[in-house]
């Protein structure tokens, strides 16, 4: 199994199995195929990256994904993270993912089609705005850092929902876990991370 070492990051067997089912090699540029299974982020063009496998696993773990979850992802990138999450929410769940770069959306859509995954919707748009027409969401995951948590994302999170988002600047970023309980927003700092900026 490719990602067995992720158990040392606290990633569960269920998530490791989902990650092993989605071939990361399909999601990286041809010139980086030899590095596809290394536990490092890789450039995918347009100033964007595919996250290191341990970060994908940890973020899925923090989200507590379950069958039937409706998930909003900000930053489709290569589509790898959405593909993994699509397995974790099952056929009754759905992944809505937003990407601002049309070329990345086209490439991600091709990969998703190739894999025969049919519970993902990829949309070109501004992540800060979320997707009001499909809200509310059980879970929201953000794969780019924000200087502040966008208010619209909190508004689109279901009561008792979970959001995982990197917050900070180009030098220091903290991965935060946000829980929404009625009018109350509970923030927890998880770990230091390094992501590309939300535009």
From Swiss-Prot:
Write the Enzyme Commission number(s) for this entry.
2.1.1.77
Which intervals of the chain form a coiled coil? none
List, alphabetically, the NCBIfam families matched. Answer: pimt, PRK00312.1
Q: Which InterPro entries match?
A: PCMT, SAM-dependent_MTases_sf
Q: What is this protein called in UniProt?
A: Protein-L-isoaspartate O-methyltransferase
Q: What GO molecular functions are on record for this protein?
A: protein-L-isoaspartate (D-aspartate) O-methyltransferase activity
What Gene Ontology biological process does one annotation of this record name? protein repair
HAMAP family found in the cross-reference section: PIMT
Functional description taken from the UniProt entry: Catalyzes the methyl esterification of L-isoaspartyl residues in peptides and proteins that result from spontaneous decomposition of normal L-aspartyl and L-asparaginyl residues. It plays a role in the repair and/or degradation of damaged proteins.
Q: Active site at which residues? A: 51
Q: Which organism is it from?
A: Fervidobacterium nodosum (strain ATCC 35602 / DSM 5306 / Rt17-B1)
Q: Which Pfam families match?
A: PCMT (PF01135)
Q: What is its main location?
A: cytoplasm
Alphabetic keyword roster = Cytoplasm, Methyltransferase, S-adenosyl-L-methionine, Transferase
């Amino acid at each position: 199994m490719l990602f067995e070492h992720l158990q040392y990051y606290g990633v569960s067997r269920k998530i490791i199995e989902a990650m092993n089912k989605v071939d990361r090699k399909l999601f990286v540029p041809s010139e980086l195929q030899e590095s596809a299974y290394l536990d490092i982020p890789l450039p995918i063009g347009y100033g964007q990256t595919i996250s290191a496998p341990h970060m994908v696993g940890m973020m899925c773990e923090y989200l507590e994904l379950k069958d039937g979850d409706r998930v909003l992802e900000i930053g489709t990138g290569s589509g790898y993270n959405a593909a993994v999450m699509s397995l974790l929410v099952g056929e009754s769940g759905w992944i809505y993912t937003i990407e601002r770069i049309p070329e990345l959306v086209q490439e991600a859509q091709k990969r998703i089609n190739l894999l025969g995954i049919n519970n993902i919707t990829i949309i070109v748009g501004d992540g800060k705005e979320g997707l009001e027409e499909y809200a509310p969401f059980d879970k929201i995951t953000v794969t780019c850092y924000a200087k502040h948590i966008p208010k619209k994302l909190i508004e689109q999170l279901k009561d008792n929902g979970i959001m995982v988002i990197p917050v900070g600047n180009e030098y220091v970023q903290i991965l935060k876990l946000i829980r929404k309980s009625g009018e109350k927003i509970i923030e927890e700092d998880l770990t230091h991370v390094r992501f590309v900026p939300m535009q």
